[in-house]
C-alpha cells in the first residue's frame, strides 16, 4: 500500500511540475527577433492568456504559460525562447524581488488606432512598419472618423507624422510645385469643406481638441516626429491664426506669438513660433532645427535611456525596456525636443547626453497619458521624401523600434498600487 502511495505521490509531483512549466521569451542580446516577440505577446493576449512582463529582467522579458500552440507560433515567427520549470520560475521571481526589477501583468490586447490619411502607405510611418512587422492588428482613422467619436472604441492612438497647425508640413518652399504636395493640400481642403470648416487649420484644431478629450478620458497617446510639437502648437494657438497666407488665404495674426496659451498644451511651453512659410521649421522646440540641422552623423549620434525604479515607477520602466541603454539617433521633421521648453511635470525618458536634446518623454493628462518620441524612423538616420521603406526583416533587433512596441503593450498592463 505504501508503495502505491509513493508512486501516486511521484506522479502527482511530476504532473504539478509539468503544469507549472512556462515559456520565457528573453529580450536580451540573445534574442533573435525582438520585434516579433512583441507580436507574440500581443497574440497571447488576443487569445485570452495573460502575459507577465518581467521589467529589467534580461532586457524586459515575457513569461507565459507553456502550450503547444504558443511554441508553434514562436517557431513560425522566429522568436527565441526557453522552457522554465517550476524551480527555475521561482529563481526568476527571487531575482526580480532582489534587484531593480518588477513583474507587470498584461491582461488584455489593447485596441489600436493610427491617425493617418486612408491612402498613406505603411512605410510612411515607423509605427505602421512596426505594427505590420510584429503582426499586430490596427485600424486607420482620419479626421472624419475622429470627429465622429470613433476614438472611444480604442485604447491606444498613434499620431501619424501630421502637421496639426495646417501648414502642410512647412514643405511649401521646396515642394509646392510637386504633384504630391498639391494633392496633400487638395485632400485636406476637401475634407475641411466636407466637415464644415473654413480652413484646414480649424479642422486640425478640432481634431487636436478631440484627441485631447480622448486622452483626458483615459486614452493612451503615442506620437512621433512632427505630430509631437505641431500638436501642442495647435492647442496653444487655438485662439489665434499662425498660418501664413500661402497656407490658408489670409495672413497670420501679427500678435499670434503673444496670444499663445501654453496652459493648454501637453508637453511644451514658452516656445517661439517660426511662421515664415519659406522656413522649413515650425518653432524652436525642434533640436537640431530642420532648417539648420547640425548633423553629428549616424555613427556619432546616440541618445541614452534613463534607468527608473521598476518597483516604484513601473510606467517609465515599461516605456524604456530595451536590451541596450544607448540608442542610435535618427532625424525627422521634429528630431528632438529642446529641454528648456519641456514642462516640468513631464518625465524625460531619453536624451542626448551633454546636449539640450530630449528624445523621448512621457506625461499624464486627466485619466490618460501621452508619450512623444522625436525623429522619423529609428533605422533610417536621415529620412527624405520618397525614400524607400525600411525593411524591418533586416533590423529584427532594433533598439529604437523596441521603444515604439513598448508603447503598444503599455495599455495592456494591470494598474497596481505603488509600493510606499
Predicted regions and their residues:
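Alpha-helical scaffolding within the catalytic cores
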Residues: 95-100, 144-146, 355-359
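Extracellular ligand-binding/catalytic regions of CAZymes and related secreted enzymes
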Residues: 21-26, 32-63, 241, 339-420
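Catalytic beta-strand/loop cores that center a nucleophilic Ser/Cys/Thr
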Residues: 122-125, 132, 229, 240, ...
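Hydrophobic targeting/anchoring helices
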Residues: 19-125, 134
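Sec-dependent N-terminal signal peptides
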Residues: 3-14
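Helical hinge/lid and interdomain linker segments adjacent to catalytic or ligand-binding clefts
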Residues: 22-23, 28-32, 63, 67-72, ...
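Extracellular/periplasmic catalytic domains that process cell-envelope and extracellular macromolecules
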Residues: 105-108, 149-152, 214, 341, ...
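Catalytic cores of eukaryotic secretory-pathway lumenal/extracellular enzymes that build
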Residues: 181, 196-197, 236-239, 244-247, ...
Amino acid at each position: 500500500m505504501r508503495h502505491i502511495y509513493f508512486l501516486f505521490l511521484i506522479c502527482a509531483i511530476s504532473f504539478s511540475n509539468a503544469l507549472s512549466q512556462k515559456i520565457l521569451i528573453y529580450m536580451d542580446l540573445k534574442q533573435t527577433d525582438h520585434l516579433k516577440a512583441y507580436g507574440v505577446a500581443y497574440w497571447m493576449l488576443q487569445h485570452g492568456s495573460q502575459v507577465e512582463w518581467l521589467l529589467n529582467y534580461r532586457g524586459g522579458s515575457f513569461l507565459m504559460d507553456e502550450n503547444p500552440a504558443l511554441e508553434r507560433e514562436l517557431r513560425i515567427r522566429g522568436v527565441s525562447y526557453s522552457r522554465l520549470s517550476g524551480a527555475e520560475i521561482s529563481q526568476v521571481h527571487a531575482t526580480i524581488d532582489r534587484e531593480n526589477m518588477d513583474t507587470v501583468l498584461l491582461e488584455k490586447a489593447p485596441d489600436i488606432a493610427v491617425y493617418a490619411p486612408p491612402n498613406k502607405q505603411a512605410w510612411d510611418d515607423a509605427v505602421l512598419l512596426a505594427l505590420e512587422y510584429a503582426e499586430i492588428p490596427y485600424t486607420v482613422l482620419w479626421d472624419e472618423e475622429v470627429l465622429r467619436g470613433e476614438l472611444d472604441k480604442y485604447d491606444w492612438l498613434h499620431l501619424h507624422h501630421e502637421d496639426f497647425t495646417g501648414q502642410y508640413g512647412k514643405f511649401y518652399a521646396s515642394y509646392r510645385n510637386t504633384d504630391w504636395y498639391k494633392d496633400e493640400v487638395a485632400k485636406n481642403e476637401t475634407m475641411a469643406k466636407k466637415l464644415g470648416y473654413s480652413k484646414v487649420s480649424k479642422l486640425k484644431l478640432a481634431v487636436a481638441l478631440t484627441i485631447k478629450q480622448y486622452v483626458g478620458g483615459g486614452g493612451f497617446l503615442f506620437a512621433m516626429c512632427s505630430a509631437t510639437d505641431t500638436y501642442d502648437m495647435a492647442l496653444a494657438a487655438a485662439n489665434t491664426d499662425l498660418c501664413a497666407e500661402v497656407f490658408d488665404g489670409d495672413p497670420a495674426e501679427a500678435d499670434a506669438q503673444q496670444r499663445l496659451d501654453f496652459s493648454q498644451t501637453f508637453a511644451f511651453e514658452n516656445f517661439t513660433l517660426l511662421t515664415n512659410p519659406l522656413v522649413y521649421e515650425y518653432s524652436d522646440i525642434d533640436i537640431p532645427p530642420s532648417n539648420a540641422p547640425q548633423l553629428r552623423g549616424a555613427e556619432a549620434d546616440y541618445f541614452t535611456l534613463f534607468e527608473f525604479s521598476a518597483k516604484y515607477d513601473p510606467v517609465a520602466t515599461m516605456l524604456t525596456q530595451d536590451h541596450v541603454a544607448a540608442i542610435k539617433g535618427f532625424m525627422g521633421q521634429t528630431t528632438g525636443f529642446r529641454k528648456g521648453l519641456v514642462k516640468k511635470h513631464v518625465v524625460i525618458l531619453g536624451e542626448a547626453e551633454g546636449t539640450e536634446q530630449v528624445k523621448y518623454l512621457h506625461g499624464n493628462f486627466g485619466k490618460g497619458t501621452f508619450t512623444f518620441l522625436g525623429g522619423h524612423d529609428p533605422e533610417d538616420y536621415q529620412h527624405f521624401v520618397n525614400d524607400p521603406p525600411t525593411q524591418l526583416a533586416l533590423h529584427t533587433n532594433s533598439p529604437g523600434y523596441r521603444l515604439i512596441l513598448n508603447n503598444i503593450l503599455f495599455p495592456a498592463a494591470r494598474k497596481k498600487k505603488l509600493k510606499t
